[in-house]
Amino acid sequence: EIIDQIKEMAEKNSDNSVYCLIIGTIYSNQESDLYNVDSALVYYDRAIAINPTDENAYINVGSMYIDKSAALINKANELPLDKYKEYDALIAEAKVFDEKALPYVEKAYELVPDDNAIRQALRTLYARLKMMDKAKALE
């Protein structure tokens, strides 16, 4: 399998974060049979440890958490009005993922402050987490 070949390359080139980033990306692809968030996080963390100034791993981890949060928010919004307890539970769970995403997106923004997509993602996270002063500062 290609993933095994890339893992082998990552082991042979342990100072090159690109292989870990590629493996993380493969595991984080929801369309893939290899989709596995935990494995993706392991490889993204390795990529960050090897190259802490490469924004891509930070962006990808943040995006994984943001996607999980968004899915929960969408699920909550589809509930009937009388399911407010389930709604509150889903929103609370989404907040946990937003909180997990925040340091990764903040670091990505620190590394590439001119990237409008990262800026918007960070602004959205700040708004969801009710950090309005920080959200407004990014306008």
Feature names for model-found ranges:
Residues 9, 46-47, 108:
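Canonical positions in the second alpha-helix
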